[in-house]
Amino acid sequence: MIMFPLFGKISLGILIFVLIEGDFPSLTAQTYLSIEEIQEPKSAVSFLLPEESTDLSLATKKKQPLDRRETERQWLIRRRRSILFPNGVKICPDESVAEAVANHVKYFKVRVCQEAVWEAFRTFWDRLPGREEYHYWMNLCEDGVTSIFEMGTNFSESVEHRSLIMKKLTYAKETVSSSELSSPVPVGDTSTLGDTTLSVPHPEVDAYEGASESSLERPEESISNEIENVIEEATKPAGEQIAEFSIHLLGKQYREELQDSSSFHHQHLEEEFISEVENAFTGLPGYKEIRVLEFRSPKENDSGVDVYYAVTFNGEAISNTTWDLISLHSNKVENHGLVELDDKPTVVYTISNFRDYIAETLQQNFLLGNSSLNPDPDSLQLINVRGVLRHQTEDLVWNTQSSSLQATPSSILDNTFQAAWPSADESITSSIPPLDFSSGPPSATGRELWSESPLGDLVSTHKLAFPSKMGLSSSPEVLEVSSLTLHSVTPAVLQTGLPVASEERTSGSHLVEDGLANVEESEDFLSIDSLPSSSFTQPVPKETIPSMEDSDVSLTSSPYLTSSIPFGLDSLTSKVKDQLKVSPFLPDASMEKELIFDGGLGSGSGQKVDLITWPWSETSSEKSAEPLSKPWLEDDDSLLPAEIEDKKLVLVDKMDSTDQISKHSKYEHDDRSTHFPEEEPLSGPAVPIFADTAAESASLTLPKHISEVPGVDDYSVTKAPLILTSVAISASTDKSDQADAILREDMEQITESSNYEWFDSEVSMVKPDMQTLWTILPESERVWTRTSSLEKLSRDILASTPQSADRLWLSVTQSTKLPPTTISTLLEDEVIMGVQDISLELDRIGTDYYQPEQVQEQNGKVGSYVEMSTSVHSTEMVSVAWPTEGGDDLSYTQTSGALVVFFSLRVTNMMFSEDLFNKNSLEYKALEQRFLELLVPYLQSNLTGFQNLEILNFRNGSIVVNSRMKFANSVPPNVNNAVYMILEDFCTTAYNTMNLAIDKYSLDVESGDEANPCKFQACNEFSECLVNPWSGEAKCRCFPGYLSVEERPCQSLCDLQPDFCLNDGKCDIMPGHGAICRCRVGENWWYRGKHCEEFVSEPVIIGITIASVVGLLVIFSAIIYFFIRTLQAHHDRSERESPFSGSSRQPDSLSSIENAVKYNPVYESHRAGCEKYEGPYPQHPFYSSASGDVIGGLSREEIRQMYESSELSREEIQERMRVLELYANDPEFAAFVREQQVEEV
């Protein structure tokens, strides 16, 4: 009974330890996985896919008899979460148990329904759900109307599902019938491809068993140049998706000419719109082209133009990766550090923020000044998404009885790269980078090189395949390099698998397989020929390559040619014989492995030559108005770059088989002259090779090495994504003393260089029997960047073996704008690296991201990615970062993650002081410098791409350090786990070495795209956090009435300024208004003012009030008095102006009387005679005399004479006389006349 509790505790401790160890693997184990662990998941891909997908993996399974059940068990194990609900529903402290359970049940229903809906569409309809469809099925599932099994039944019985099955069956039957025509090959010679399932077809593409076995199997016969059977595969339709958008352009005026597609305005606006908007789509996987459908006048207002355009995506390129990322994001509740897929823009196909992604990109281009158009992001609408079928003829499969040529159909390689994508259920991610359809900005190009030789088999096949895939805007405008397969004889002893993937920058983003290059190796030369493809209908004239004699070779072509160049079968030997030749040389018996970069020598002869390269420009798929026959080889040397630097790569290996290394890139040239130098081999008739294409010319000479050494190491060289360099390669043999001389010259020349003060390589010896794993890291995993200090170069190590005369000289011609070449070595018992490699955590796929705002030292592009795997010790590794041209014309930015990572930690054995709030204080600066000195070297040595560290602030709570890390390259969203483990290890190291106690449980790490910057600003309750939407910077802003002094937390003005309110006033904070003062109030006095600075008394107020009233009364009285006086003066002046004597008065008086009579109703009958007298009548009355003969001072006779002298008639005169008599005799009538006079006045 006593031992039982103890045993239970021990068991619980062991269980917790197992859980923790399961979720937090060590960094070293995660970074350097063994080859078997890396390649096991790839073998398991076949049984996780449909049954038809596993047919082509039979060859792999024959060579790798793995335990299927064991592998399946390891594959299907899902990792436990390290903590409770790390990415799911959180438990809030204020929640009750019932609420927490209800929330978790609700979250569980949502997650299950999401999975069910996604899987139903994926399984039965093989497409993505629309927004309405998704919400419809989600509502049915969440409401319990339809169960997940009923949902599957409904989907399986749908018409769309049945038509999809019929279409798949039809394609499968055509494939089987076509595969029966291929010639049989012995099964025993089937080569396995490094435990990688290469034959997994795309979900929308049928399996090609016949093509795969024809390309993977090789009979044991002698090498020959004869080509016999040519089999054309069946035509299969490839899916395309067309998304139609509409957007409103501001600042453009609609005109009728825009309706005519042939008008100048329509074409000009169309070209301008496509060039601007295309940047938002080029980073998306599967993007092919964009075209404008029409321009419309806006409905709401007359300003601007509505543009309707369609974007075409390749369904083959996005379907598989899209589904994987759908499952990945829908399963994010179980996301952990081992599943590390970059968050590519493929996600926007499956998440509702697709519109926001495009709109944000367009808006950023306009705000940054990169766009002349002003699109309205709110007006962007996704109108329709439809799928179309395009017919594409499969590549020709060349079958030769002599097994000298075995071409791999590019569809197989395409399926290989698609299969290399881990699905959403993967818990182990391979370190070998698959073809990432969304990692390169505009497009991706895959290459595969493998070599397999079973024990006892003396035939080793080196296959170099280039399934080039490019996008088109018009049919003849894409250059394609075809699959290349080389065979050679070697005493193969060691079985090695060398899967490699590569990508190159091109104009289009969709993936089109076209053309197959067929190569034959004879005794003295190799022949290359490109086969015609039916996907391009317009032929392009071939350019003639002059002979390779004692003069420089100039190659002319057209910079406007970007289509593939078809060759006829009749030119198989005539045109290619001058292009590619391999000379046999007999090497010495000693073995040596060297890697030497010569910074100033041009060819294998060790002599300086004038190699001229042209700067590559971004490929454009637009048609050119200039003729195709215009040569790009001109004599204008002013267009040449200012500085040219040749890089010579000397590879001396202990390989006994023929090393075939080939490189081809697709670019569009500027109009610049290009000359290739004369290649003079040291011994033997080695002749350079010029690949006849319109996009790149490269000189290549491949010697055939024959050695008696029994040991074999098979290596493959693969180009990495985003290659921007022209390469001239020559191969020859030389003796070891010349190699030493070249090495010395390299060191002298590089040491004397003033522009680049760094070494190309250092040489150290390793055991000759050691087999190494060569890996060229991408730029984000470089050991360091260019520096002017030679002291930092002590970490650069180059591995080499004892000397041998088997050498392959590679002369790489590049521009001088290059990042440094860095080489590091990992031995069994010693690790010598400048940076601890956590590439699996930070940048697994190996993509690099170009930031235009960075300085020149940060603009370098990774030039190549070489990963060669063997079946030997996985810890023996040589890492090489090849330099490439950091072109200034690059403008692609891929946003797979953030450039910033926030983290905070708590130091428990240090006391906080108020001075740590002030960033200008000595204590703050001292503590900041201490943490920078501790953290920066540690982070720089453990984090790839680490740029700088910024201490944001110190906060109380012992001491809480909030920091922000910046990276030179974007990091994956799930980088938090890696940073967390590194900081956790730092906490332990700091406590053991510096007595700095850091609480591990206080670590908080968030990436910049997911983090809340305000969280790390620690704004208090008196402030708010504001985030700059463009820079992402956060700052605290105090509320009104609060103030931050010396960057301390916001405090009240009442506390900071005790004398804010005077005269004993009370300070108070009014929310939204700020600080106010509440002043004192007495019985008959009080204080007032903003700061209570004014004294007010009641008697004074009363006196002022009385005085004010009296003053107003006086003012009103004065105004009234002056108004009355003014009226009187006006009246008197009017009276003085009116005369009283003379004859002039009488007519007026008479007229007034007449007017009065006129308006008197008593005298209506007499109005007509009074109309002509309208003058004012004086205010003086007529005075009647005693006699009736005198009226108004005039006698009747005088009045009669006055009227008679006028023009009045007799009747009128008599009437007026009667009126006058009435006026004189009737007082009332006289008063009436006077009233009329006053009114007239």
Curated annotation (Swiss-Prot):
Biased composition (Basic and acidic residues): 660-678
GO annotation (BP), single: extracellular matrix organization
GO cellular component: cell projection; extracellular matrix; extracellular region; interphotoreceptor matrix; membrane; receptor complex
Single GO MF descriptor: hyaluronic acid binding
Region feature (Hyaluronan-binding motif involved in chondroitin sulfate C-binding): 1080-1088, 1136-1145
Stretches in topological domain Cytoplasmic: 1121-1241
Tissue: Expressed in the retina (at protein level). Expressed by photoreceptors of the interphotoreceptor matrix (IPM) surrounding both rods and cones (at protein level). IPM occupies the subretinal space between the apices of the retinal pigment epithelium and the neural retina. Expressed in the pineal gland (at protein level).
Effect of Y1042C: Found in a patient with vitelliform macular dystophy; uncertain significance
TM spans (from-to): 1100-1120
Stretches of the chain found on the membrane's Extracellular side: 23-1099
Region entry Disordered, spans: 180-223, 660-684
Outcome of substituting G1008D: Found in a patient with vitelliform macular dystrophy; uncertain significance
Annotated disease: Retinitis pigmentosa 56: A retinal dystrophy belonging to the group of pigmentary retinopathies. Retinitis pigmentosa is characterized by retinal pigment deposits visible on fundus examination and primary loss of rod photoreceptor cells followed by secondary loss of cone photoreceptors. Patients typically have night vision blindness and loss of midperipheral visual field. As their condition progresses, they lose their far peripheral visual field and eventually central vision as well.
Protein name, entry field: Interphotoreceptor matrix proteoglycan 2
Lineage, highest ranks first: Eukaryota, Metazoa, Chordata, Craniata, Vertebrata
